Amino acid sequence: MRNRLNSAQKQHYYRELLSIGIPIIIGQLGTIVLGFADTLMIGHHRTEELAAAGLVNNIFTLVLVSYMGFSYGLTPIIGRLYGMEKTNEIGGKVRNSLFANIIVGLIFTLAMVILYFNLGNIGQPEELLSLIRPYFIINLVSILFVGVFNTAKQFLDGIANTKVAMWVMIFGNVVNIFGNWLLIYGVGPFPELGLAGAGISTTGSRILMALIMVGVIVFKKEFKQYGRDIIKSSITKDDFKEMNRLGWPVALQLAMESAAFTLSCVMVGWLGTIPLAAHQIMITISQLFYLVLSGMAAAIAIRISHFVGQKDYAAVKRNAYDGWRINIMLSLLLGIPVVLFRHQMGGLFTDNVEVQQYVSVLIILMMVYQFGDGLQYSFANALRGIACVKPMVTYAFIAYFVISLPMGYTLGFPCGLDIIGIWLAFPVGLTIAGYLFRRRFIKEVDKLAANKTANA
């Protein structure tokens, strides 16, 4: 392994990054296919259900992205140990991470229960609340299972095995789409449940994926030793504190980014059902870019954590910049067909002509913020790979809460630009976040390299 990783004389690491990143992207693309399928099926069932799903999905995205961010604290720990060839210590870290993730999942579940009883106080259309409430409760059941899946996935990612999670996610999403078809429309003996049916199918697939991942780690020969180490290890105060020290800053950083979109969704809801439905379609389309960029960014974190274990800081920098360049190219490749067919995209999700017109305009704004999005994902994950996560919280707060959200509100309402104004703020916040993350990454890696030289 050391010979394979230790190659600082290389000029670029595109092939190695792609070999790790492509399975992550493919697995995550299964999620976007699922999102498209959900939105397509719900939108053609009832437009009101599409708007209700948009609100609930945005709220849960905030929670699930934060939860995923917390689990990300495991990756640099596992990656560093893997790079140092100390694989016997990995099992204990995974067990402590699982315990920490369960505690955090319970906290998130309690917070969502409190929010459920206050759904009528956030200014949403009254006609949507009867659809929102049951869909909200059904999704609530799946939170803890998402935490189990995340822990297993971050462990496997840390040891550079990204294909298992890819196949599990693809399988789970196929099951989900089939379940949607049966339960939204009431095929055969199944009842026509509409939006509630989509929620039941999604929750069921999340539970199934968590159980499969646990089974793979415990019973598959390749991972059996890790599974034994996880089972026989114990919860320790130091490891538990380490998981929280690395997990919470990433969770908060991702939460603030997601909150900017979620609170923007709430503001769009003030404009009415039609803009909210268009916003939901745009969030679904933009997830295609998000999952591709974040998948490659995850590969950046994995590769960097391995080289940190070897103290090869030249390779650390090269992997970060090579990953960023790949993300720029991926954004361009994805963006060209989306822009060319922007007038047809809305029609895939709904027959409402007014919603389709909104979507065709918002697609242009979505493409504008792809540069900033690629920059901030790449260097946020580069910071995660070197386990420098605390500064990310401050930078995210400045970019999203001090700049992006107030700007979106000002342009949308006092300036009268409505949903266009709200969306104009996204590229500004994302680009500022990316610049701050990149600057901090360079500073920290230079410091690590200087310490290595001083101690040589």
Which residues make up each language-model segment?
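Short alpha-helical transmembrane segments in multi-pass integral membrane proteins
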Residues: 1-21, 78-144, 190-247, 304-369, ...
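N-terminal transmembrane alpha-helices
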Residues: 8-40, 44-45, 61-73, 77, ...
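Transmembrane helical elements of multi-pass membrane transporters/channels
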Residues: 19-38, 138, 172, 205-209, ...
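Hydrophobic residues within alpha-helical transmembrane segments
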Residues: 22, 26, 56-59, 99, ...
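Helix-terminus/linker motif at the lipid-water interface of multi-pass membrane proteins
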Residues: 29, 33-51, 119-126, 182-193, ...
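Small-residue hotspots at the loop-to-helix junctions and early N-terminal turns
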Residues: 47-58, 132, 136, 199, ...
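Small-residue-rich hydrophobic transmembrane alpha-helices
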Residues: 50-113, 146-165, 265, 278-342, ...
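Short runs within selected transmembrane alpha-helices of multi-pass transporters and secretion channels
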Residues: 71, 75, 139-157, 165-173, ...
